Regions:
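Extended extracellular/luminal ectodomain segments enriched in beta-structured repeat modules
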Residues: 91-114
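Activation corresponds to long, low-complexity, non-globular regions
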Residues: 38-59, 219-254
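Bacterial N-terminal signal peptides
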Residues: 18-29
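N-terminal secretory signal peptides that target proteins for export/translocation
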Residues: 1-12
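Short beta-strands within extracellular/lumenal beta-sheet-rich domains
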Residues: 71-93, 167
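Short, hydrophobic alpha-helical membrane anchors of single-pass surface/secreted proteins
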Residues: 13-17
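Sec/Tat signal peptide C-region and signal peptidase I cleavage site
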Residues: 32-38
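Aromatic- and Gly/Pro-enriched, solvent-exposed loop/edge beta-strand patches characteristic
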Residues: 39-70, 121-219
Length: 254
């Protein structure tokens, strides 16, 4: 096993939420068909691409040798800089509300067998338990090098273990306001198996670690995700050929 560097709703609940949004948009369009200022509800899924790569976990053991390690991320806040060739996929293109977010989770092994190790227990011991995640809204600090971001708001933390092997969607009871140009980041207080490695160079992400403290086990374990609202943090690590598997749904009322 290696490192790489609200209220949960069911899929039915999220489908209903989107259906309600679409219905609202339709009613607005019908109510004022001649109004030049009227416009349909805008819904954008930040981070969504035509294909989602599988998470790099669980690992595989052959003849007691770890051939393919389970890859996870932990103790970090990060966001995708490029996803499948799309630049700045988590930068808000307009002011609106983040109403939900999703995360694609692998199913790490929980038992010692001839082909697997107890990955969950390993990561629990090394990074903390349970597996957790939340999203945050970051405001870039202009002119900062390496780049710095200020956390302006964040969602509640979600426990991920019950959702291993699936892609849960978490609808927010209190949607998060995001301004144009701000970034929706993923925060991992402990660890999460939502990481895809060995992708094309058209995938890269930036993490909240200091330069030269990006890849060792000590760097990962000693990392601190950005969870203090109003605080500013340096995002000094840039990881290529990898992807954080999450999305955020941005809505703008007409």
């Amino acid at each position: 096993m290696r490192f790489t560097e609200t209220k949960a709703t069911t899929r039915r609940g999220w489908t209903a939420l989107l259906a309600a949004a679409c219905l609202f948009a339709t009613l607005v369009a019908i109510a004022a068909p001649g109004d030049a200022d009227s416009a349909p509800l805008r819904v954008v899924v930040l981070g969504q691409t035509s294909e989602t790569p599988p998470a790099s976990c669980p690992g595989k053991i052959v003849n007691n040798v770890e051939i393919t390690p389970c890859r996870v991320e932990g103790h970090v806040t990060g966001f995708q800089s490029i996803a499948d060739g799309v630049p700045r996929p988590f930068e808000a293109p307009f002011e609106g509300k983040i109403v939900a977010w999703s995360i694609t989770l692998a199913k790490p092994s929980t038992k010692e067998t001839k082909t697997t190790t107890d990955e969950v227990s390993f990561f629990d011991e090394f990074l903390g338990t349970p597996a957790q995640a939340r999203i945050g809204i970051l405001r870039p600090v202009e002119g900062s090098k390496p780049p710095k971001y200020t956390l302006v708001r964040q969602s509640p933390t979600e426990v991920l273990n019950p959702y291993f092997g699936s892609t849960p969607v978490f609808a927010l009871d209190h949607p998060l306001t995001v301004l144009k140009g701000q970034v929706v980041a993923l925060t991992i207080p402990t660890w999460a198996p939502m990481f895809a490695l060995n992708l094309s160079p058209e995938n890269s992400w930036r993490g909240s670690r200091l330069p030269e403290h990006c890849i060792s086990k000590e760097d990962i374990q000693g990392g601190h995700p950005q969870q203090g609202v109003g605080k500013t943090k340096t995002y000094g690590c840039y990881y290529s050929e990898a992807r954080l598997l999450y999305t955020a749904t941005l809505v703008k009322k007409p």
